[in-house]
Regions:
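Conserved catalytic/coupling modules of large nucleotide/cofactor-utilizing molecular machines
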Residues: 1-143
Length: 143
C-alpha cells in the first residue's frame, strides 16, 4: 500500500493464477496440454510469465540483481495486462496459439532488464505495443 494503491490486488491476482496453474498441472500430466480450454491455456502461459519473468531474478546481472518496487509494480501490471488482453481477445474469437505468439510477450519478459531511469518510458512503450498487437490480431482474424 506504500508503493501503489493496487499493489495488493495485483499480488493477489498473480497468486491466484499461480495456484490455478498448480491445479491445471494435474490435468496436463494426465491428459496433456491440448485437453485444456483456450482460457486455461492462457492462464498457464500467464502463470509461466509470472514465474519466469517476474519471480526469477538473475543475481549476476548488473540490472536484474536489484529490482525496485516501481519496476516490480510495472512488471505485475504488464504480465496481468497481457493476460487480460488475451482473455478479451479469446472472448472475441481469437485463436489461443496466435495470442501466445504475440511478440510483446518477449518485451514483457525483458522489462526486468530495463534501467531505472527508463522504467516509465519502457512501460508505456510495452503497453502501447500490447494494445497495437492485440488490435492487429483481432483485425487480422476479422473479429
Amino acid at each position: 500500500e506504500n508503493v501503489a494503491n493496487d499493489w495488493m490486488k495485483l499480488r493477489q491476482r498473480m497468486m491466484t493464477l499461480l495456484q490455478e496453474e498448480a491445479e491445471l498441472e494435474e490435468i496436463v500430466k494426465m491428459v496433456g496440454m491440448d485437453a485444456l480450454s483456450p482460457g486455461d491455456r492462457l492462464k498457464m502461459e500467464a502463470a509461466r510469465s509470472i514465474r519466469e519473468d517476474f519471480l526469477h531474478q538473475n543475481s549476476f546481472h548488473e540490472i536484474d540483481t536489484y529490482t525496485s518496487l516501481e519496476k516490480q509494480h510495472n512488471m505485475m501490471r504488464l504480465v496481468l495486462a497481457f493476460y487480460d488482453a488475451g482473455l478479451d481477445a479469446l472472448k472475441q474469437g481469437a485463436d489461443i496459439n496466435d495470442i501466445v505468439k504475440l511478440p510483446v510477450r518477449e518485451q514483457i519478459g525483458r522489462y526486468k532488464y530495463t534501467k531505472e531511469d527508463q522504467l516509465a518510458a519502457e512501460y508505456e512503450k510495452v503497453t502501447r505495443q500490447l494494445a497495437a498487437e492485440t488490435a492487429e490480431l483481432l483485425g487480422k482474424e476479422g473479429l
